[in-house]
Amino acid sequence: MGQRGWPPEATAIVLHDALGRWPEELGFQPPVGWIRPEAHQEADVNRPTFVSVTAAALVPGPTAAQHVDPALISYFQEQLEGHYRADMLLGPHDLIGTVSAQYQLIDKLVRSAQGETRSGLLRVGAAYAALVGWLYQDAGDLGAASFWRGITQEIAARSRDRHLFGYSLVNLAQVRTDLGDGYGVIDLCEAALVDDRLFPKVRVMAMQQQAHGASLVGDRTAVDRLIDVADDLISRVDDDLPWGNACRRTPGYLEVQRATCYGRLGLGREAESLWSQVLDAVPATARRDRGVYLARHATAAAGAREPEQAVDIARAAVEIAVETGSARMRRELGILEKAMRPWHDAPVGRDLAGILASVNEGS
């Protein structure tokens, strides 16, 4: 808390980011011992970026009390479904600000709501935080993604909803997957699966993510076992929760995961065969996901010693990568570039370099 008439440090930082001036430059009388945040020794933190990432989740209180209509819960749930659809079409950059602002509003309402209305808002708030985390992850900012995955876990714990809490652990495991920490992924997914009362959807999510962890540590047997068990469960996914529905929205969801794991394990021919089947079922509306799958398919073709096919597939992936700005897609194309190194000096390698130039220029 700041002294009377002097804003708390978090507010001082927001004022500076908005107006370019510190409170004492705006006429406030600084308290004894005040040190501007920029003077602290934090060379490893880009404070403006940090504040912009965290601001929606760290609003200081108290806030003014207000009546909260229970109908707002369904309103935010309906908006969430629209955001999921937009994410598939647009990619992360056009949505982060909108979804973060809605999370901030939900957080404000939670502070005034009572009883079941408050519990319902906490549950939907956790889903919004999870989506913000995913958007940052897709944009390639794993630090911001980790922060928002942590907020998801906090809100899930506050909601006392075991299914949401399990979902939040899977969210954390997704970040560990992108960090290449296979054992971290396995630990988090096993922690989620300890609770055998979880809805089938959450168990499916945890098992497929654990399969990714297994692929990172080179365990194909575990990959197949986990995907097969999840496949036995997926027909029982029948809840009406607004979050975590990729397993229902994504055609061939589990085979997508298996193909990705096989590619990571270096099983080029097996992965290439699976991607050929999976991509036939992916709708044009799932443009961002299709781009990621195409990039992985191209890498699998390279692993199967089919460089010309890899380059042909890469053309379509690059077009989508440029449109969506997905860092995840650029990362997949970077993996393809490494897989094509044996043909670096061949005409097909030069063709790939030309195709990837538009992505590399925009990164």
Language model regions located:
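Compositionally biased, long intrinsically disordered regions
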Residues: 24-74
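Conserved binding/catalytic microenvironments
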Residues: 66-363
